[in-house]
């Protein structure tokens, strides 16, 4: 997936989760941050950030954050995870002549995909510590609900898309959201499968790189 030409700036402050004040050297500008995570290792005063200009009268902010840096480049755009998942089907052993449906209903929720009738929920990961991708980066009641709904059905697949290259595996972030960790363990016991993929990120593009394991450490 290619990026448009990006503009470099440094973070001045974050406001209300989705707004960044960015220093472009010659001026300050508010930008949209398309990620609800806490991003403490990526978004802080003085942090480098790469942004794309937004040319739309419907948008109030002229820039949108695309990349941050935490030893490696990290894609901040959480919504890209679904597109990256579709690019990863062969890599994850899910490709071939398959029927892909988007936004599929399950109970009172909507899950991201159905692959030949198999429900799939995709999660974007940006936090990596010591080579281990951690999800979530902020408490997620919605994510926990989806896991229990898949567990009740007794099948389905959860895919973690790590939008950086340095994760060797993925696991639940118990210290951030114990409820999600418990739901993930329960879903696995009930028959839900888990996969993960990491990505190569440059200032020009992001692309799926390789499948990595999802770990379930013992309590």
Residue ranges of predicted features:
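Non-catalytic C-terminal interaction segments of nucleic acid-processing enzymes
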Residues: 2-3, 7-10, 22-24, 139, ...
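Short aromatic-glycine-enriched beta-strand elements
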Residues: 16-21
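Beta-strand/loop nucleic-acid-binding surfaces
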Residues: 27-41
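Flexible glycine-rich surface loops and low-complexity tracts that mediate binding to linear polymers
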Residues: 44-56, 198-199
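OB-fold/S1-family single-stranded nucleic acid-binding modules
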Residues: 57-73
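Short peripheral tails and domain-boundary helices/loops at the edges of structured domains
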Residues: 68-91
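A short acidic/basic microdomain associated with nuclease active sites
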Residues: 90-106
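Conserved catalytic cores of phosphodiester-cleaving nucleases, focusing on short active-site segments
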Residues: 111-137, 149-150
């Amino acid at each position: 997936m290619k990026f448009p030409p990006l503009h470099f700036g440094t973070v001045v402050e974050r406001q209300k989760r989705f707004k960044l004040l960015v220093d472009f050297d010659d001026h300050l500008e508010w930008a949209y941050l398309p990620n609800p995570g806490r991003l403490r290792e990526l978004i802080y005063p003085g942090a480098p950030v790469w942004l794309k200009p937004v040319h739309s009268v419907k948008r109030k902010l002229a820039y949108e954050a695309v990349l941050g840096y935490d030893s490696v480049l990290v894609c901040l755009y959480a919504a890209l995870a679904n597109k990256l998942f579709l690019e990863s089907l062969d890599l994850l052993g899910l490709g071939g002549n398959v029927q892909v449906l988007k936004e599929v209903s399950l109970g009172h929720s909507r899950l991201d995909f159905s692959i030949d009738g198999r429900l799939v929920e995709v999660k974007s990961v940006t936090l990596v510590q010591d080579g281990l991708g951690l999800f979530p980066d902020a408490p997620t009641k919605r994510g926990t609900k989806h896991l229990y709904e898949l567990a009740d059905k007794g099948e389905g697949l959860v895919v973690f898309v790590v939008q950086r290259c340095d994760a060797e595996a993925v696991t639940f972030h118990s210290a951030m959201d114990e409820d999600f960790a418990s739901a993930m363990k329960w879903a696995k016991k009930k028959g839900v499968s888990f996969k993960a993929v990491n990505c190569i990120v440059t200032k020009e593009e992001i692309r799926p790189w390789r499948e990595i394991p999802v770990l379930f450490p013992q309590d």
